[in-house]
Amino acid sequence: AAGYVRGIQSNGIAACPKHFAVNSQELRRMASDSVLDERTLREIYLTGFEIVVKESAPKTIMSSYNLVNGTYANENAHLLQDILRRDWGFTGAVVTDWGGSNDHALGVKNGSTLEMPAPGGDAVRELLAAVKSGKITEADVDARLDELLTLIYDTHAAVQNHSRSFDADAHHALARRAAAESTVLLKNEDNLLPLAPGTKVAVIGDFAETPRYQGAGSSAVNSIKVDSLLGCWAESGLEQVGFAAGFDRQGKPDAAKQAEAVALAQKADVVLLCMGLDEIKESEGLDRSDMCVASNQIELLRALQKVNPNIVVVLSAGASVETPWANHCKA
């Protein structure tokens, strides 16, 4: 992480490691309280942050939604002041997660610099009232203002001189290479793979048309170009006998789609079945309740095997999945 931060900031912009700290679950992440002793906190949960702060001096850190020992991380003086700034020497700005400010004035007092999203005049009025009431001091506000202005000045030149043009084709080629080199072959019964040129293939599975290549939520990006299996078929040298979605992406049973896929499979030498986890399974704000591929996909696999045993499963998932169904495919 330290090397990554150095690489980002070498371009004159700010890196923002997150989420500080003990953000160990997504379910109820805005209300959960991570309760732990000091040794566990420092030796297990904070070690990664300590390394990145001391070795690469990130200009910002993002606080987490959760409470730590009863206090919201974004208002936690022990985390933001005692450990981050005093013990580690962090001099940058602390940024809230999106909507992660519970008490803005208390956050400012205890080390939170920037509230996101921008709350407009509400934050100003809240801070003015807090200063007048004695809840916080002008010195608290000044300290956060110094951090914010330093961030603005340090990144101003890079922002002003930033070119929005880049070599999209080169970036795409690198992404394709990364995808190819990270593919893992788990099984290849009867040496079914690689498929010989001209092999008649039935392409089945919603993911063949709309691939899963990233998570959902705030991590999702709008790509300039995305390669789908169907879109790249001309490069394969294989004969496609047809495509069928085969299953509902969100896991609902669909007998008609399954029947269409089974009929198509009977026309092919090999079935290429694209399975995986959908966007709902892999999004922020929740934790998976199991490690299973949706049951409608497994039911489809079993139905296809009855009419064509030569099945290659292409499994797309951003996390581990159980594969008790692997005996129903050859590769």
Name what the model sees in each region.
Residues 1-331:
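Glycoside hydrolase catalytic-domain context in secreted enzymes
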